[in-house]
């Protein structure tokens, strides 16, 4: 049985989920990263929006998106802030499986449900299922909360937030900003309060990191309509480096144009 199917059954729900590491045969290992099913589906939907290929949407993307929705419809639980994903984490920072409603998971689930609703409208199918998703979206915690220093909160719990996501934490990951990029829930064209909070979080994370993390920062600044800052990040990411030691705040490119250190895809 493929790991992506077994992962959902192990969690007592239907649909599919996956592990941190997965191979082309449908198997994975190490640990679960449940919200990544929504992240995968984000790119399926984006492929449709760029191509407008209804055949692709109907035959390939939609059934995968619907399966991911089935998983979350069965896993979400009630909380004071609304429906939340229980026992989640914020890759790759902070404690594992201790808090429900982590921004990373909530933002991805909102994106998944919203895009799947749009898919049913485009394909003119599954009206009852669409209505179920719409009703769930109304009760869903969207993963957008502004914290004490004006940041977009990564965690619900203030103590965890203060310890792991403070204003001087220059961690490479921007998991709580996935609604800004590659998602589209946050934008200065939609709501300046949340886009300003995302900007504050970006400033806290800093402009120096690994190669891939600089690319993520660059894209986030572009989404905030700050071309000058995005250009600076582009220059930072193209700095020539020669070091072979593992470091997380000196990203750049080697002479062969591979990024690092460390090299990651």
Model-assigned labels for residue ranges:
Residues 43-46, 65, 70-75, 181:
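Structured mid-domain segments that build the active-site/substrate or prosthetic-cofactor binding neighborhood
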Residues 1-3, 22-25, 29-54, 59, ...:
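Active-site core of glycosidic bond-cleaving carbohydrate-active enzymes
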Residues 57-67, 83-88, 232-236:
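Beta-strand segments within the central parallel beta-sheet cores of soluble alpha/beta enzyme folds
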Residues 1-13:
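Carboxylate/His-rich catalytic cores and anion/metal-binding grooves
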Residues 2-4, 62, 69, 81-84, ...:
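Beta-sheet entry/capping signal
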Residues 67-122:
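Acidic/histidine-rich catalytic neighborhood
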Residues 12-27, 93-98:
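Aromatic- and acidic-residue-enriched carbohydrate-binding clefts of CAZyme catalytic domains
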Residues 12, 17, 33-46, 81-83, ...:
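Core alpha/beta catalytic barrel or barrel-like domain that forms the active/cofactor pocket
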């Amino acid at each position: 049985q493929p790991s992506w199917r077994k992962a959902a059954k192990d969690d007592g729900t239907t649909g599919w989920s996956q592990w941190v590491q997965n191979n082309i045969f449908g198997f994975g290992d190490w640990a679960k990263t449940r919200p990544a099913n929504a992240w995968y589906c984000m790119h399926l939907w984006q492929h449709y929006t760029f191509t407008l290929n209804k055949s692709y949407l109907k035959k390939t993307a939609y059934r995968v998106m619907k399966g991911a929705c089935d998983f979350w419809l069965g896993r979400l639980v009630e909380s004071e802030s609304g429906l939340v994903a229980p026992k989640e984490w914020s890759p790759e920072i902070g404690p594992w499986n201790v808090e429900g409603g982590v921004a990373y998971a909530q933002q991805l689930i909102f994106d998944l449900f919203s895009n799947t609703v749009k898919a049913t409208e485009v394909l003119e199918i599954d009206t009852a299922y669409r209505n179920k998703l719409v009703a769930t979206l109304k009760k869903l915690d969207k993963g957008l909360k502004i914290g004490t220093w004006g940041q977009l909160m990564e965690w619900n719990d203030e103590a965890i937030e203060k310890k792991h996501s403070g204003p001087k934490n220059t961690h490479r990951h921007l998991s709580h900003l996935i609604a800004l990029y590659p998602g589209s829930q946050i934008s200065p064209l939609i709501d300046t309060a949340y886009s300003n909070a995302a900007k504050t979080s970006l400033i806290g994370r800093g402009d120096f990191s690994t190669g891939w993390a600089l690319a993520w920062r660059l894209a986030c600044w572009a989404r905030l309509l700050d071309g000058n800052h995005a250009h600076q990040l582009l220059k930072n990411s193209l700095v020539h480096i020669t070091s072979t030691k593992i470091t997380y705040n000196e990203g750049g490119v080697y002479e062969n144009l591979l990024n690092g250190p460390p090299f990651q895809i």
